[in-house]
């Protein structure tokens, strides 16, 4: 079976590499699926993130038509505060708005991971509770000026500079980064990929 990561995210690539535990035989390729990420009317956050992960995996599978036995991994991460999905910021002002909203509060990070093969698609959802410390305007301005939050759900990266805002987490750290390792390993193992 040929493993394919349906993502160009460097964070997901690095995390998936960890699953191989350094074994030379654990290899994968990457494709860049293009899907519409617009939430459907009335769609709950957990349904939305699972749908996107599955759609990314299936779109990736469609890009692998010439490959022998592809198994395509798709993933999506969202940040949810008070039942509102906080996606990637559209600009610096939006990033600042989101960071102000997260300041001093707990929010949920949801990451869904899907594995699509010719005959089936399996999805896992992982939720992690993240609590932010209180952020000053100077903290927010400096962080946004670093440009780190501009391509991240919820306008922060726990694995980078944004990690200094995280007071605590309850759940999977790798979920917050963008690919829950335990659940991804389970999906791969169930598919016979080790």
UniProtKB/Swiss-Prot annotation:
Q: Which residues form a coiled coil?
A: none
Q: Which Pfam families match?
A: Maf
Provide the protein name: dTTP/UTP pyrophosphatase
User: What EC class does the entry list?
Assistant: hydrolase
Which cofactor does the UniProt annotation name?
a divalent metal cation
Family in the record: Belongs to the Maf family. YhdE subfamily.
Q: Which reaction does it catalyse?
A: dTTP + H2O = dTMP + diphosphate + H(+); UTP + H2O = UMP + diphosphate + H(+)
Annotated site residue numbers, Important for substrate specificity: 11, 77, 159
State the active site: 76 (proton acceptor)
Protein's job: Nucleoside triphosphate pyrophosphatase that hydrolyzes dTTP and UTP. May have a dual role in cell division arrest and in preventing the incorporation of modified nucleotides into cellular nucleic acids.
Subcellular localization:
Cytoplasm
Q: Gene3D superfamilies per the record?
A: 3.90.950.10
Q: What is the lineage of its organism?
A: Bacteria, Pseudomonadati, Pseudomonadota, Gammaproteobacteria, Alteromonadales
Entry GO CC: cytoplasm
Query: Some GO term, biological process aspect, for this entry: which one?
Result: nucleotide metabolic process
The answer, when asked if Cytoplasm is one of the entry's keywords, is yes
């Amino acid at each position: 079976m040929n493993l394919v990561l349906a993502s160009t995210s460097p964070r997901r690539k690095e995390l998936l590499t960890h699953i191989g535990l350094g074994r030379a035989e654990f290899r994968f390729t990457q494709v860049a699926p293009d899907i519409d990420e617009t939430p459907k009317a009335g769609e709950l956050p957990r349904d939305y993130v699972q749908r996107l992960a599955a759609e990314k995996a299936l779109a990736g599978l469609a890009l692998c038509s010439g490959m022998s036995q592809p198994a395509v991994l798709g993933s999506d991460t969202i940040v949810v505060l008070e039942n509102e999905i906080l996606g990637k910021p559209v600009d610096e002002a939006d990033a600042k708005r989101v960071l102000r909203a997260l300041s001093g509060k707990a929010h949920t990070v949801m990451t869904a991971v899907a594995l699509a093969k010719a005959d089936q698609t399996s999805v896992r959802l992982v939720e992690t509770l993240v609590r932010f410390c209180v952020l000053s305007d100077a903290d927010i301005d400096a962080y946004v000026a670093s440009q780190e939050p501009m391509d991240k759900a919820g306008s922060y990266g726990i694995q980078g500079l944004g990690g200094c805002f995280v007071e605590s987490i309850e759940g999977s750290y790798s979920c917050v980064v963008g690919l829950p390792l335990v659940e991804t390993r389970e999906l791969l193992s169930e598919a016979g990929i080790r």
